[in-house]
Structure formats: structure tokens, C-alpha cells
A protein has these predicted regions:
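Conserved alpha/beta-hydrolase "acid-adjacent" motif
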Residues: 282-288
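N-terminal cap/lid segment of alpha/beta-hydrolase-fold proteins
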Residues: 35-66
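Alpha/beta-hydrolase
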Residues: 191-276
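N-terminal secretory signal peptides
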Residues: 1-12
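Conserved acidic catalytic loop of the alpha/beta-hydrolase fold
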Residues: 136-153
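Catalytic histidine-centered segment of alpha/beta-hydrolase-like enzymes
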Residues: 309-319
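Conserved hydrolase catalytic core segment
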Residues: 157, 161-188
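Short, surface-exposed "cap/lid" segments of acyl-processing enzymes
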Residues: 65-70, 74-106
Length: 342
């Protein structure tokens, strides 16, 4: 990870955020949850990365049993401003289903997510939790997943900078990645309205390893590109879930996306890839994604634009479009014209 200056501004800012970190959960008590007519089993875990404890969360239809046939594993990778469970297991009473974890657990997947260093329930540190550090976090987390599930290769979904983390991980640990879904992804960031605006703060990101995050900032995720593509209740529910975990988040991914792109070389990504872009997403142009897509060496690849969607395809009004294309990609039948490895 790149070392950041430890100037007074960063230290004083860190003192305001409090401890925030969660101790090792190892395997916290499991919980059976009833959602409508469907029940789900869930459990908390922790991964250890040196002195850093990384919070992990798992959800599936039923509790695992000894000797069962392992389910396909889907690992969900969060973005720059929010942690794992609020992003992927959000409850918005009276406004429909928003939990990507429950949706794919219902499809028969063993679904996991985590909080990266400095986010949510994971340890607070003086690091900036950049993309390279995220790869190390994913290594520690997948060690736990592989131990608990017996699966050696996992499906990954990453949204926004979560896609950059997942893509970078797929390059470093290709043997752990089965199929890879990258949503709200950016390659070079050229002509990106969001990143052009964000780059105005690049010196702040260099000088400070954390940035403030309040309710209005969380709301803006759903309004900055195209108002009306998400339910206002989602931003409020997300803020309610996220703000008790802290009023700041690391700056590392913002710095990488403002000054260090590209961080994922498509020529080095071996896994099958699905690129998903919301029609109005300001983080990357279609041409930027096409340039990435055409360089991918695996011909098992798809690029899909979802109409009526903005940056957050996970939590948009038309999120069921994401579920549809993602399920089809993850359950793609094996090819019959090539010999499969034994």
C-alpha cells in the first residue's frame, strides 16, 4: 500500500471518528431470518490480516450441514463510501426487496460480503484502504470462505471501486476466481463527469487518509447522475444503517480513481467477465468500458447497459434487471466444444 503523509490534519481527523472497529467474531452465533415467506440463515465471521480484523457476513437459504454438496459461492465487494452489509443486505420496509444477498441466496448461492480495512465493522487504522490494500483484504477474507465452504473458486461481484478491487484481485489470485461481475466499473476514467469533479479534491485525498461522510453525501449517490432512478427511501435507509458505523471513510479508492487509473489491466484478467453499466452512470462512459471489454482475453465475456439505471445498480429502481443478467451470467452452462479440466 502507498504510504500517506501523517500530517496533523489526518491525525486530528482520525481522533474524531472513535474506535469503530469490531473485535474478532471468528464465528458469531448464527441467525435464522424470516423475510416475507422466505427464511435465510446468516452468520458473522472475521478474517485476520496482521493486526487488522476484517468483518465478514454470510447468508444462505439454510444452515450448512456436514457432508453437504457445497453451494456456489458469491462474494460481494463494496465500494468507496459504504460498507458491505448496508450495501448488499439493505432492508427498506414497505418499498420492496433490496437485499442482493437474499436474492442470490434464494437462487441457491452461498453469499458472502465483508468490510474492508477502515470501513464499517472492520478495524479502524491510519491507512487509506486503497485498491492494492483491498486485494490483501480479499486474500484474507477468501482464506476464510474457502475454509468454511470447501470451495476453491468463487464468483465475485464488485460495484464501483468494489469492481476495481475485485478486478485487481482476479489478476493477483486468478485461481480463486470463477466468474467476475463488474458493475459501475471504470477503466481509465476519461471523460467521466464524476471523476472530473472528484479530482478537484485530489490534494485532500493525498493529505488525509479519511474523508467525512454524512447523510447528504449518502443521498447524493442516488441523485447525482439522474434523479428519479432510485427511491428516496433507499438513501434514508442506507444512511440509517451506515452512519452508526462512523461519519468518515478511507480516501484510498478516491485517490486511486482520481489520480492512478487504470488500476486493472484487462489483458491480465483471465476469468469470464460481465461488465454492467447503468444508462446514466457518471463514473465511466460506455466507450471507456468498451475499450476495457475488447481487451479482455477470455471470450466468455459480456457488456450490458441497464436502461433507467444510474451509478448504483444494486439499489436502483430497476435493480431486478441486474438480478436477471447477473443470474444468467453466473449460471452460464459449460461449453461443450472444449474439454473441461478434470
Amino acid at each position: 500500500m502507498r504510504e500517506m503523509s501523517a500530517g496533523p490534519s489526518r491525525r486530528s481527523f482520525l481522533t474524531r471518528i472513535g474506535a469503530g472497529g469490531l473485535g474478532a467474531l471468528a464465528a458469531a452465533p448464527a441467525v435464522a431470518q424470516q423475510t416475507g415467506k422466505k427464511s435465510f440463515w446468516s452468520q458473522e465471521y472475521s478474517a485476520q490480516k496482521g493486526a487488522v480484523k476484517l468483518y465478514m457476513y454470510r447468508k444462505r437459504r439454510e444452515a450448512p450441514t456436514r457432508g453437504e454438496r457445497p453451494l456456489p459461492v458469491l462474494f460481494l465487494v463494496h465500494g468507496s463510501s459504504l460498507s458491505g452489509r448496508p450495501t448488499f443486505d439493505l432492508n427498506v420496509p414497505g418499498h420492496g426487496d433490496y437485499s442482493l444477498m437474499e436474492t442470490f441466496a434464494g437462487y441457491g448461492f452461498d453469499v458472502w460480503t465483508m468490510d474492508f480495512e477502515g470501513y464499517g465493522r472492520s478495524s479502524r487504522t491510519e491507512g487509506n484502504s486503497d485498491i492494492a490494500e483491498g486485494v490483501r483484504d480479499l486474500k484474507a477474507a477468501t482464506d476464510v470462505v474457502m475454509r468454511e465452504t470447501g470451495q476453491r473458486r468463487l464468483h465475485f461481484f464488485g460495484e464501483s471501486s468494489g469492481g476495481l478491487r475485485a478486478g485487481a484481485f482476479a489478476i493477483v489470485y486468478p485461481d480463486r476466481v470463477d466468474r467476475l461481475v463488474l458493475a459501475a466499473f471504470t477503466y481509465t476514467g476519461e471523460v467521466s463527469p464524476t471523476l472530473t469533479d472528484r479530482a478537484k479534491q485530489v490534494e485532500f485525498y493525498r493529505a488525509n487518509n479519511r474523508r467525512p461522510r454524512d447523510r447528504e453525501m449518502i443521498r447524493s449517490i442516488f441523485t447525482r447522475d439522474k434523479p428519479g432512478t432510485s427511491d428516496p427511501a433507499v438513501g434514508e435507509a442506507l444512511a440509517d444503517a451506515e452512519l452508526p458505523l462512523g461519519d468518515s471513510v478511507p480516501t484510498g479508492t478516491y485517490l486511486d480513481m482520481s489520480a492512478n487509473l487504470p488500476v486493472v489491466d484487462p489483458l491480465k484478467v483471465q476469468a469470464p467477465v460481465l461488465l454492467v453499466r447503468g444508462e446514466y452512470d457518471g463514473i465511466a462512459t460506455e466507450q471507456d468500458l468498451i475499450n476495457f471489454f475488447t481487451k479482455l482475453p477470455n471470450r466468455d465475456r459480456q457488456l450490458i447497459v441497464l436502461p433507467g439505471m444510474s451509478h448504483s445498480v444494486v439499489l436502483g429502481l430497476n435493480r431486478d434487471q441486474l438480478w436477471h443478467v447477473m443470474k444468467g451470467f453466473l449460471q452460464m452452462p459449460q461449453r461443450h466444444d472444449i474439454r473441461q479440466n478434470a
